[in-house]
Amino acid sequence: MRGIALFVAGVLVGAAVQATVAQNAGAGVVGLNHVGIAVPDIPQAAAFYTEKMGFREAFRNSNPQGQPTAIYMQISRNTFLELQQANAQRPAGVNHFGLHVENMKTAVDMFRQRGATATDPAGPSAFSGAILSNVTDPNGVRIELAELGPNSLQRKAMDSWK
């Protein structure tokens, strides 16, 4: 039941993001890329989303012991669910949502001009190869900006979608 509630929350975030994307047309925001949730048991969560929801595993990151620390589940060509390990700094539940941006500098400049605080872009990510930045809304919700270059794992998963 909790998994379904998290999924519904992600869908609602997606609807809100689509309105934002429409308002930012031409400013480099492509759309919702992912919803990130922290879970206490990544393999169990991945099994649920694969077997019950029909999502496919796009890619994963594992620690040196081979245990997954993050798994991207692909919902559609352009939309993912990021499963992350819950811990003391990242409690279980919806953790953030990610926007796909065409050009990180353009997107960061636009959000800063509008008064939002955006971190300086970092990248490419050692995990996914994407260039990342973060904006935090007034309620503390983290919005991850992701520029998906041709070698990023997200881009490769999107390109392989059938």
Feature roles, as predicted:
Residues 78-82, 140-143:
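Short, charged/polar, Gly/Pro-enriched secondary-structure boundary elements
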Residues 2-7, 12-14, 19-28, 30-40, 61, 71-74, 88-112, 131-136, ...:
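Vicinal oxygen chelate
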